[in-house]
Amino acid sequence: RYEYDTRINRICGMCNLENYDTTYDYLFSSAGSGPGFATWKRVANLWDDTYSFLNNEYDMHKFQAKYNTLDDKRYHETCKAHQAEGKAHWETIYSYACQLNSQLVIIPTRNLVHNNGIGVANSTHSDLTLDQVLPQLRQLTYQPSYELSFPIKHPLFILEDVEYMQKRLHVMGRDSRTHRKYVKIKSLIWRIRH
């Protein structure tokens, strides 16, 4: 359905809210999670592994005016560091391609992914044990997964679900400066105790 629609960047399998109450089986968001996603070659063709977009002063000015939170500024600095080291990092080239092209991500309204990569011996992506993970994030990582039911109920319009994004940012502790600090302090205390 969206293979040739350049407004769509990828299809995610993970819903950070486990279940999100809406009329449809999926929604559109400006960001999604990495576990269990699919994309198309047309999206990979937008990736700039030399980070040359950082040298485009005019477009970077527009970009930074739109994405101007503290997290956005830190991510931009991370991107510059990746450019300086001369090594492409998938996360940054992928994210920037999506944002620079104003693309949206498809998110299922029920989580379809069961992630068992944290707290497992010889894990590929994490050396943390389960007791080192903040309970709030553990809940996010180990939430139940559900089967997709057919026929799929498609949204009528391609429009970002801003309410979903706000709830997602809250769950991740990134919705406000105060909440971000609270989550960081809680995480630090948790790690000291464990």
Give, region by region, the residue ranges found by the protein language model:
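Peripheral/terminal regions associated with large enzymatic or DNA-binding modules
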Residues: 1-194
